[in-house]
């Protein structure tokens, strides 16, 4: 499940970053497994309902 946005939009270079920073006021955002993945949200709300294994995969993929 993504926060708005369809899969093709996710693949655009700045789509997720814009979505995360402008809409959710996060520090930055990335596309991971065809959904936007936000880092550094200002409040503790979850933008994505995402499984632990998928979160680990996204963290690992984005950081490395």
From Swiss-Prot:
Pfam annotation, one family: Toxin_3
Applied uses, from the record: Could be considered as a biological insecticide candidate, when fused to Galanthus nivalis agglutinin (GNA), a protein with the potential to cross the insect gut. This chimeric OdTx12/GNA variant shows a gain in toxicity against insects when administered orally, while maintaining similar effects as the wild-type toxin when injected (toxic to insects and non-toxic to mammals).
Expressing tissues: Expressed by the venom gland.
Isomerase is among the record's keywords: no
Source organism: Odontobuthus doriae
Role played: Excitatory insect beta-toxins induce a spastic paralysis. They bind voltage-independently at site-4 of sodium channels (Nav) and shift the voltage of activation toward more negative potentials thereby affecting sodium channel activation and promoting spontaneous and repetitive firing. In vivo, this recombinant protein is lethal to Locusta migratoria larvae after injection, but has no significant effect when orally administered. Is not toxic to mice after intracerebroventricular injection.
Domain notes: Has the structural arrangement of an alpha-helix connected to antiparallel beta-sheets by disulfide bonds (CS-alpha/beta).
Keyword terms: Disulfide bond, Ion channel impairing toxin, Neurotoxin, Secreted, Toxin, Voltage-gated sodium channel impairing toxin
First-listed, main subcellular location of the protein, grouped into a coarse class: secreted
LCN-type CS-alpha/beta domain boundaries: 1-59
Protein localization: Secreted
Family of this protein: Belongs to the long (4 C-C) scorpion toxin superfamily. Sodium channel inhibitor family. Beta subfamily.
GO MF annotation terms: sodium channel inhibitor activity; toxin activity
GO cellular component, one term: extracellular region
Disulfide bonds: 10-31, 16-36, 20-38, 32-58
Protein name: Beta-insect excitatory toxin OdTx12
């Amino acid at each position: 499940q993504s926060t708005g946005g369809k899969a093709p939009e996710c693949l655009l270079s700045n789509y997720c970053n814009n979505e995360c920073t402008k809409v959710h006021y996060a520090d930055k955002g990335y596309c991971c497994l065809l959904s936007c993945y936000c880092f550094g949200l200002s409040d503790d709300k979850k933008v994505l309902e995402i499984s632990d294994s998928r979160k680990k995969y996204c963290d690992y993929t984005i950081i490395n």
